[in-house]
A protein has these predicted regions:
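N-terminal positioning helix adjacent to the helix-turn-helix/winged-helix DNA-binding module
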Residues: 1-9, 54-57
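Hydrophobic alpha-helical connector segments
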Residues: 2-6, 15, 22, 71
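Alpha-helical hinge/cap motifs
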Residues: 17, 42-48, 91, 95-96
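Terminal helix-turn-helix DNA-binding modules in bacterial transcription factors
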Residues: 20, 24, 43-83, 103-104
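Helix-turn-helix
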Residues: 27-34
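…primarily DNA-binding HTH/wHTH and HhH modules…
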Residues: 66-67, 88-104
Length: 104
């Protein structure tokens, strides 16, 4: 990310991927309008904030699962409402469940 305000957001979400603050909330924290935030975010990352955050969480999940953390623990640590919501996101993103992903 090029914009220093977006770099701070990236650092904060790397430290706490479960943070559920909306794009509007992050825009407010950064002192931007939601529209400016969306434009800058799209320009710097090539994707909308929501998609980027999902990818960040997915990468964090892969690291934790590779370290043999339990699926339900990973789901809760990353801010998912339930294990099933996490598994559904994982399946949509990678085409398989977390358990099967690591046995392929």
């Amino acid at each position: 990310m090029h914009d220093r305000r977006l770099k701070r957001l990236e650092s904060a979400l790397q430290r706490n991927p479960a943070d559920a603050l909306s794009a509007t909330g992050w825009a407010s924290r950064a002192g931007m309008s939601p529209r400016t935030f969306s434009r800058l975010f799209q320009r710097d990352t090539g994707m909308p904030f929501r998609q980027w955050r999902q990818q960040l969480r997915l990468l964090a999940a892969l690291r934790r699962l590779a370290a043999e953390q339990r699926v339900n623990q990973v789901a809760l640590e990353l801010g998912y409402e339930s294990t099933s919501a996490f598994v559904a996101m994982f399946r949509r993103a990678l085409g398989t469940t977390p358990g099967r992903y690591f046995t392929m």
